Amino acid sequence: MELTEMIRSRRTILEYKPDKMDKDELLHLFNTAAYAPNHHMREPWKLKIYEDSARSSFGEKVVDSYIRLGLLKTKQPDKLAKARQGYDRFFNSVPYHILFYMEKQDDGGYVDDENFAAVCAFIQNFQLLAWEKGIGTMWTAKQTLLDEIFIRDVGLSPEKHKLVAVVQAGYPKKIPEAKERSAMGESLEWIHTSQIKGERAE
Ligand SMILES: Cc1cc2nc3c(=O)[nH]c(=O)nc-3n(C[C@H](O)[C@H](O)[C@H](O)COP(=O)(O)O)c2cc1C
């Protein structure tokens, strides 16, 4: 597949087949994704990959966080129990859940921003490389990634680590329709040399 076709045809996949991908193939994709740009070759990406029975316990931690943060609409115990069952089914229906994180270096300063950007570049490389091999992904990033209890629950430290994303990966059961993008003409401006002076916004 050509790169243009790969970028345009990739979809966020919500439903997966149960089949697991070959681990060597996955490792190969990660090794290629690591050619993402990253300043000073810090290679800040770190991954935890949840599979098999670890998916349920990871899913439980995610749902605990959703409840803590008030992200679920209901507070009724029976409805919460049903929601938990639904999430458990979802977490077990996806072969791999990949938690991307990084070590903090300057407590939210520009180095951390650079590293965060590099991890995002890695993730998109991975999504496209996976798509080329017929593997679907879903990039998720909710407030949970900032939840200090959740960060500890996954064995990390809010002081030392920043969570970047959870990405689901597996062979797609259903490929959603394309979501068209807006034409870029509205979102960009060409700046001519004559316009450079007096540009500072109020
Ligand atoms: C930072 C980030 C967070 C996202 N979070 C979610 C999410 O929580 N749930 C979800 O279904 N998709 C999530 N997505 C995927 C987007 O919804 C998806 O890319 C968008 O709808 C366009 O669809 P497409 O990827 O199929 O083109 C996220 C994507 C990014 C980059």
Residue locations for each model-derived region?
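N-terminal amphipathic, basic helical "cap/leader" segment at the start of enzyme domains
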Residues: 1-93, 199-202
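Short, well-ordered beta-strand micro-motif
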Residues: 49-51, 99, 168
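Structural motif
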Residues: 95-97, 164
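C-terminal helix-cap and adjacent tail motif
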Residues: 5-12, 162-202
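Short, acidic Gly/Pro/Ser/Thr-rich loop/turn segments
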Residues: 37, 57, 105-107, 174-176, ...
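Small-aliphatic-rich amphipathic alpha-helix that forms the alpha element of a beta-alpha
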Residues: 33, 98, 104-152
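Short, electropositive alpha-helical surface patch
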Residues: 150-162
